[in-house]
Structure formats: structure tokens, C-alpha cells
Design a protein with these regions (language model features):
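Conserved core of the sugar-phosphate nucleotidyltransferase
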Residues: 62, 104-184
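Short phosphate-binding loop-to-helix
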Residues: 63-94
Length: 198
């Protein structure tokens, strides 16, 4: 199964473009959300759910299962993800940001990975960041791994050695992994995810 997080508005977009959810941006002849759904279908994943928020009615045309984050203005992606708890605690789920592109190989690698939580990342992130920003550390976050385990992720840094890659916005949870995730972050869950991001 797949869960696509589309609750956010896309606050960094120009006002004209933010009239629609961010995932409705068109690249070529398809919107981002259309491309994501197509990628999942082509990979054999037909049970797809959307976690909606901003302008939820726009997504009705896709005729997909939806979970709604009514507090989308004040909460973050982890809060949105927990809205799909009924799926995550029972099924293996690929979770995707609703505004990303990735090679099908990244999705395939996640599907065959045996870990209870599997995170996709780009080890060649610097090439893209150099195109996007004047300084390569602008908007980059820590990503440190050892023995296939993540030691640190998602913090600001001024040290290039703290960044072994960048999280791609694509992650797989097995039910046992989701259970561990919730247990580790119990305090954040209890505090409405005030300081936690995915």
C-alpha cells in the first residue's frame, strides 16, 4: 500500500501557484500527484491513500481512500501521517511526500528492502543542491548513517561531513516498524508533534 502526504499548502510557492495544493503543480503534461499515482500503479501498488488538508475537495477526482488532517495549518507531516494509523499498524506501507520526484529504482529498492523501517536517500545530493542554492549547505540537513542505521537526520548543520545524503521524502514502514516509531516518539505524539518532522 502507499500513502501520499498532501495536507500542506506549499507556503514557499508564489501566491498565484498556491491557489491549488502544491502537488497540483504541472511538470510537462502531468501534475506531480498524477505522476506519483502512476508510479505506484506501475510498481504494482494499487491501494493508495491520500492524507489531505488544504483544499481537500481538489483530490476527490482521484477516487482514492483519504485520511484528513483537519489541523493541517498548525501541524506537520508526522501529525498528518498518524491520521493513516489504521493502515500503518496493519499493512506494509510506502509513505511519500506529495511534492517529490524520484526514479522508479528508488521505489523498487524500498519494496525489496527487508527492514522494518526503510528510508530512501540521495548520496549524490550535492549536485542538485549546487543548482538550487548559492551555498551548498543552504536548506541541507544532517543525514548520518552507520551500519545501515540512521544516527541523525533533519538537523541544521554547517559541517559538510554531517551530510552523507539527503532524505528523499520516501519511506517504507512495516507494521512492526511503525509500532517502534510510535513508541520512540511517544512524547511527541502526546504533545501533538509540536517539534517533530519527517
Amino acid at each position: 500500500r502507499a500513502i501520499i502526504l498532501v495536507a500542506g499548502r506549499g507556503s514557499r510557492l508564489p501566491k498565484k501557484l498556491s491557489l491549488n495544493p502544491k502537488s497540483f503543480l504541472k511538470i510537462g503534461d502531468q501534475t506531480i500527484i498524477e505522476k506519483l499515482i502512476k508510479n505506484f500503479h506501475q510498481s504494482g501498488i494499487n491501494k493508495i491513500a491520500l492524507v489531505t488538508g488544504y483544499k481537500r475537495y481538489k483530490f476527490k477526482k482521484f477516487c482514492l481512500k483519504t485520511f484528513h488532517n483537519e489541523k493541517w495549518k498548525k501541524t506537520n507531516m508526522v501529525f498528518s501521517l498518524n491520521k493513516a494509523n489504521s493502515w500503518l499498524k496493519r499493512y506494509k506501507c510506502i509513505v511519500s511526500y506529495g511534492d517529490i520526484f524520484y526514479e522508479k529504482k528508488a521505489l523498487k529498492n524500498l519494496l525489496v528492502n527487508k527492514g522494518s523501517i526503510s528510508v530512501s536517500y540521495d548520496p549524490f545530493w550535492k549536485k542538485l543542491w549546487k543548482k538550487r542554492f548559492k551555498k551548498v549547505l543552504d536548506d541541507a540537513e544532517t543525514f548520518r548513517i552507520k551500519n545501515k542505521n540512521i544516527l541523525e537526520i533533519g538537523k541544521k548543520t554547517n559541517k559538510i561531513n554531517d551530510i552523507q545524503g539527503q532524505y528523499m521524502g520516501l519511506i517504507k514502514f512495516e507494521p512492526r516498524g511503525w509500532k517502534k516509531f510510535k513508541a520512540c516518539l511517544k512524547n511527541d505524539f502526546d504533545n501533538k508533534f509540536s517539534n517533530l518532522y519527517l
